[in-house]
Amino acid sequence: MTTESNPSFTSEPNASLQTGVDHWSALLQNSESELAKAQAEIDAIAYDLYGLEGDDRAAIEAMLQSSDAEADDGDADGQDENLTSADPAKLTSELLDYCVGVAFGRWDIRYATGEKAAPPEPDPFEALPLCAPGMLQNAEGLPAKPNEVDAGYPIRISWEGILVDDSTHEEDLYKRVLEALTLMWGEQAGSIEQEACDFLGVRSLRDYFAEKKAGGRYFKEHLSRFSKSRRKAPLYWPISTESGTYTLWLYYPRLSTNTLYSAVTQFIEPKQTEVQENFAKLNAKQARTKAEDKELEHAHLLVAELATLRESLLEIAQFWKPDLNDGVQITAAPLWKHFRLKPWQKTLKDTWGKLENGNFDWAHLAHSIWPKRVIQKCIDDRSLAIAHGHDEALWAETTDATGKSKWQTRQNAEAIAEELISQQTV
């Protein structure tokens, strides 16, 4: 259970975060108690079905207890699997992640404020829902679009899918999170914010969200939250300047071919103008204070870094056609140098290298960047042709002398491939 999809942690708007932590701990304890009770009932049924009693039953129970102890000792992560208490810092991090999702329109904040009743528990034998519980949905149960949200929805949604760490911008990540906290806690939002800082051990929430040269804490925790085994799939991407002093946050499910262009025209270029004007103003002063000298140095660095970021994103935008079917790592790979968290940057850099080498030519992104290489491969690999929708153009089903059907490339497949390549490179 996490607060990311279950707003129970925030279901009492007038309560403190500590009250929420205590409430969540009680839920965990109750869940463990119910699980233990159910397990005991299952064990009793199994013993009865197999006619196990006395010494046989005692031997099995001793063996199970021994296995459990060995599993605990051999836990590779060294983590306690007993979830009878809640971690305040972890829950606070999940709450803030929830608020970011609210700003992007991922989560329906009305569940957290109590305006809407919590979704019913699903039947275990029902088909999996299209959306996670608590998501902002349309009438068909799909993620809501701008024209599918009630006019009276209580908070503004950043439909463009871009937020920014910039106190002067209306899409400032910190301010959008604070809007969500204010909607949930009203006049108590200030004390809730301070309590969150205390739990997280940070001076301010802006510091918590900020990306540094080597990455920031929020994204590190977000990445961990959306990682399982070897699969890493963060939803909120920090795209930063080299020093991390300016960061755009992209919402993965809403990426499009226009995203990077929007990032440049709506965020980076206005910021460039602002910083350049401030730099010129400070530089023109005859006598500056130490604070102004420091501000001038910062502005000089930011002018250069924003120009580099703008140029890089426009270059990537020319070939970047994100397709969610490719998955997070492949989609994010071209942007690897703009992530500051080193382990994630390395993962994406390695992925980009494999994309360049043709290891992932099944991906839509590979097809859009290297159409000649990928389409030529489709002549020899029908599964690849199917993946890119070229199977009917390049392959035909034939019948041999024995009447057995088989697939083979069309006689004019090379010419067709050249035509397909020319269409992709126009």
Give the ranges of each region predicted by the language model.
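Extended amphipathic alpha-helical segments enriched in small hydrophobics
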Residues: M1-Y47, I268, F279-A280
